[in-house]
Amino acid sequence: MSKQLVSIIDVPKHIGEEITIGAWVANKSGKGKIAFLQLRDGTAFFQGVAFKPNFIEKFGEEEGLEKFDTIKHLSQETSIYVTGMVKEDERSKFGYELDITDIEVIGKSQDYPITPKEHGTDFLMDNRHLWLRSRKQMAIQQIRNAIIYATYDFFDKNGFIKFDSPILSSNAAEDSTELFETDYFGTPAFLSQSGQLYLEAGAMALGRVFDFGPVFRAEKSKTRRHLTEFWMMDAEYSFLSHDESLDLQEAYVKALIQGAIDRAPQALEILERDVDLLKKYIAEPFKRVSYDEAIDLLQAHENDEDTDYEHLEHGDDFGSPHETWISNYFGVPTFVVNYPASFKAFYMKPVPGNPERVLCADLLAPEGYGEIIGGSMREDDYDALVAKMEELGMDRSEYEFYLDLRKYGSVPHGGFGIGIERMVTFVAGTKHIREAIPFPRMLHRIKP
């Protein structure tokens, strides 16, 4: 049997040709003289059909019956080389199918644990290495791949340079209570929460930089939106205003959505994602509302029949129900800007004339997906940043390199970060972030 293989996703290019596919058996059916195989090879799913008389005619009765019997008794996830003629077939949901003419078993699969029936989440997570083979899980990973590809493409086209920040650090970029600590040859070190502080150094050297890699948050949270290890894209840029930053973030998110539509249409179809709704998010401008305007809206509607969130005062932080209501109210991704300085990071630049608010923005995704981007203008004045750190009781010695950036040619600059898993969850339309990464790390899960 020829081993010049054709990927399933390329099968439509070979109508009327005999081809060979390397695949796994996802499922099978049939009776009597006919057998149907549901095949997958990582690129897509496909159906093959085998007819007993055709095998007897081609190989003779003994060998033909043996090969057909092999097909009928293939178990789930057996790996095979399958050869056949690609034929158009309107009855097939693919529009074509493979008329199987030969088969070769590569690797047998006995007692595959994830059978085509309902399984509990814990069981599926314990068998995550196998669950990834299922149709929906494959689709989610294909969307993840499309979003990562679109990330690199977007930043390259917009003049950004890939800049790799360290994973081990001696300081905290975000909440110091959420750090994973390790011993670095006798010195305390921490797994990175964000590459932002180092990216600011990159922006002062290269103008526009971005980083993409794993980050770690020791959050004792069991919500559907939190992981302890996830992949973050951080971008930093010099000589860009707050409004220009929001424009860039909006363009980036739209590019990610478009990238998934262009590169993973079959995956979106498998997940039954409303593509027209995704296209609406691309076509319409994102809404921008200030934190204080958002609080006013929440207070004005808190007694509405369909609301389900707690009362907030100005100065309170949003919870997930508040974020959901705000984004659903506007119906498109919504930037909430200028939050109180009291619960935002030390490095954020105050709003001119209003030191109680900072030049920052969170992008809230509709449909209940909440925050997907956080960004801000960074404090570029040395004395102001030192004063803020002293106010918070921070140890300046751990941030000397960061303060140096304000001493030697400081410029207006800002940046933002996006957790790729949250974006994948939003674009894919899935309910839980654990499915947006191959092997999720959560509060009570570190295996497999």
Swiss-Prot record:
One of its GO terms (cellular component) is cytoplasm. It is found in: Cytoplasm. It comes from the Bacteria. Its main location: cytoplasm. The keyword Cytoplasm applies. SUPFAM superfamilies: Class II aaRS and biotin synthetases, Nucleic acid-binding proteins. It catalyses: tRNA(Asn) + L-asparagine + ATP = L-asparaginyl-tRNA(Asn) + AMP + diphosphate + H(+). It is an enzyme of class 6 (ligase). InterPro entries: Aa-tRNA-synt_II, aa-tRNA-synth_II, aa-tRNA-synth_II/BPL/LPL, Asn-tRNA-ligase, Asp/Asn-tRNA-synth_IIb, NA-bd_OB-fold, NA-bd_OB_tRNA. GO terms for biological process: asparaginyl-tRNA aminoacylation. Its EC number is 6.1.1.22. The keyword ATP-binding applies. GO terms for molecular function: asparagine-tRNA ligase activity; ATP binding; catalytic activity, acting on a protein; nucleic acid binding; transferase activity. Keywords: Aminoacyl-tRNA synthetase, ATP-binding, Cytoplasm, Ligase, Nucleotide-binding, Protein biosynthesis. Belongs to the class-II aminoacyl-tRNA synthetase family. PANTHER family: ASPARAGINE--TRNA LIGASE, MITOCHONDRIAL-RELATED, ASPARTYL/LYSYL-TRNA SYNTHETASE. Homodimer. This is Asparagine--tRNA ligase. It comes from Streptococcus thermophilus (strain ATCC BAA-250 / LMG 18311).
